[in-house]
A protein has these predicted regions:
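Solvent-exposed beta-hairpin/edge-strand motifs
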Residues: 278-292
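Surface beta-strand/loop "capping" patches
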Residues: 234-257
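Asparagine-centered strand-capping/turn motif at beta-strand->loop junctions
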Residues: 264-268
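Active-site-proximal helices and loops of the catalytic beta/alpha 8
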Residues: 1-2, 6-111, 115, 143, ...
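C-terminal beta-strand-rich structural cap/linker in extracellular carbohydrate-active enzymes
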Residues: 296-319
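Substrate-binding cleft of secreted/luminal carbohydrate-active enzymes
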Residues: 151-171
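Substrate-binding and catalytic surfaces of secreted/luminal carbohydrate-active proteins
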Residues: 124-126, 148, 156-157, 180, ...
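Active-site clefts of carbohydrate-active enzymes
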Residues: 112-140
Length: 319
């Protein structure tokens, strides 16, 4: 494995089925690979393990960063929390609980910033599939909006977003494993040809459409994240959550200048309007996505209004 680093300059390892290997092996393997990478001039070599679970259980994941000494693990708990709150009908407090448990990881909340996050994958299934399973009879329009909202969380909340191929083309699938591994090119697989796609995609054609609404939305989210250091590596503070679908709000703090970006999501089918706690130094704002008030309502308080199944991104600016 060290030869892959030295000969080909790979930037990291994704370790499949990491939970099924004795911890003592990872305790030796990880530092050895990091040392080889540093010697090869790759100081930020990233290693993360797959610890597959369908549960919103950060403790199950975190133990592998403490006992196995893996630098990071795929954040299956993030996928479960977004599935429950956006595809399903759970309150937004499940998201707050997810992030409260960041303290469990070796290195705490700072280490959780480098957890690879996702909402779809090749084993468990696609987010569009979960939306349709958890909400029988849902319209195509609402399915698309919920998938868009899930991706908005993926790109703006803490962690390193992992987009599963085909989600940007409206793939939903019919389950996990083979049922979530459709062809991007024109398929001849009968089960794939009969699938329901989101956003107007035709199941029988090829799927490289840069005009697809999900492709455009994900590209826009990637640009937003790329432009804002706070969204890539800033501290995250949960500002608002509740026991029912509705408002979930967080602040992301710019690691270079300390400025705040407030992100508010609405997981319900009715508009939400609320006062949200912010830093007292954050007084003037500009909209990065959606509609944002130009000024705080009072020191430490900011008004947000979010349409159903939508989100806003409001950035504090220097006065």
């Amino acid at each position: 494995y060290g030869e892959w680093i030295e000969r080909f300059g790979v930037d990291g390892f994704r370790i499949d089925t990491a939970r099924h290997v004795n911890p003592e092996f990872w305790q030796q393997f990880v530092p050895a690979m990091l040392a080889r990478a540093r010697a090869a001039g790759i100081p930020n070599f990233h290693i993360f393990g797959e610890v597959n679970t369908s549960k919103m259980d950060p403790a199950l994941l975190a133990v592998h960063t403490r006992v196995d000494r893996l630098p990071a693990v795929l954040d299956f708990a993030f996928a479960a929390a977004v599935r429950e709150s956006v595809a399903g009908n759970a309150g937004t407090e499940v998201l707050a609980t997810l992030f409260e448990d960041d303290a469990l990881y070796e290195g705490g909340a700072a280490a959780a910033l480098q957890l690879p996050t996702f909402i779809s994958n090749h084993d468990n299934g696609r987010f569009g599939y979960f939306v349709q399973q958890l909400r029988p009879g849902i319209s195509d329009d609402e399915s698309l909006r919920r998938v868009l909202l899930g991706h908005a969380m993926l790109f703006t909340l803490r962690g390193v977003p992992v987009v599963y191929y085909g989600d940007e083309q409206g793939f939903a699938g019919a389950g996990g494993d083979q049922d979530a591994r459709q062809d991007m090119f024109e398929s001849q697989v009968a089960s794939y040809l009969s699938e329901r796609h989101l956003g107007g995609a035709i199941a029988g054609g090829s799927h490289f459409d840069t005009r697809h609404p999900l492709y455009r939305a994900i590209a826009g989210l990637a640009q937003l994240r790329s432009a804002q250091a706070a969204l890539r590596r800033g501290q995250q503070i949960v500002r608002s959550s509740g026991p029912k679908p509705g408002l979930f709000a967080v602040s992301r703090m710019d690691p270079d200048n300390g400025r705040e970006i407030l992100i508010a999501f609405n997981t319900s089918l009715t508009a939400v309007s609320a006062q949200v706690l912010i830093e007292s130094a954050s007084r003037r704002f500009v909209a990065l996505h959606g509609n944002c008030e130009a000024e705080s309502s009072a020191p430490g308080s900011y008004h947000v209004a979010v349409a159903p199944l939508d989100f806003v991104v409001c950035a504090a600016v220097a006065e």
